[in-house]
Amino acid sequence: MYTRPLADLRSADAAGFGGKSASLGELTASGIPVPPGFALQADARAEPMSGTVREAIVAAYQALGDDPPVAVRSSAIGEDSAEATFAGQHESYLWVRGADAVCEAVRDCWASLHGERATSYRERLGSAGEPPAMGVAVQLMVDAAVSGVMFTCNPVSGDPSTIAVNASWGLGLAVVGGEVTPDEYRLSKVTGEVLQRTVARKHLEYTPGPEGAVRRDVPDDRIEAPCLEDAQLAALGETARRVEGHFGGPQDIEWAIDRDGELFLLQSRPVTGVRKESGASESRSAMDLVMDTFGARRGESS
């Protein structure tokens, strides 16, 4: 059996299914809303897609509903170590629909292990040999009215007293593609107070379409409007504290709020690459980290 429900996974399963899938299982077990789905173990990559692996993927996908749209996301083994993170180096695909398309997206996730981006990154780390083993996480898509990422510390300085939230309309694809700049918020981790708001001009969003995510113009009255209300920021801050408490350290969290106003977490991983002793000029920018976390392709690409 090559697949397991995400809800059944725990941290100990990271060695077989990858950190992303194991983390989603941990979040579910802690009572935090996570879209349901299944994980494909890393060993499946060594088997032909035409045989039992495909049968397992199709059966697990069909158990989620009648051809539901899903996210197909790489979940490499050891991808978020203390020394380095592979976030954004391997491909993930959004709004994939149909068993054939899901299987193809899984193959594309595996193929990204040998892509130029991932290979170059491994070379910079001095580990250009055999790529890491990779599982795959498949989750029901959230029809996001707004989505974003948040860090339970300052992602540049490492300051543990604040929560950094970035948000944009719809799916996160416009941010990944550099088409819009997200709104930025800073919250006090202690009091929940909003310490800073920077509202950006968000003229584009990606929403569901018949064949995948569709790029749309944002109505004029929302272009320069804040994505998040105070109550939503409060909910995000409380959730961030819960997640950090569960995992025992600063977290980089991807989230979405659906069109009914319900908050879902899409992944959580340790914050890496922050050098507390260095100035901001020596660290990666917050936007670099946001783009890494959001990294995914539209369903059409799969």
Residue map of PLM features:
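Single, functionally critical "micro-switch" positions that shape active/binding sites
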Residues: 36, 87, 153, 177, ...
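N-terminal beta-alpha lobe that positions the nucleotide/phosphoryl donor
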Residues: 1-137, 146, 223-248, 259, ...
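Conserved catalytic alpha/beta cores of large enzymes that bind or transform nucleotide phosphates
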Residues: 167-252, 257-258, 285-302
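Beta-strand scaffold of nucleotide-dependent catalytic cores
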Residues: 73, 83-84, 94-95, 104-106, ...
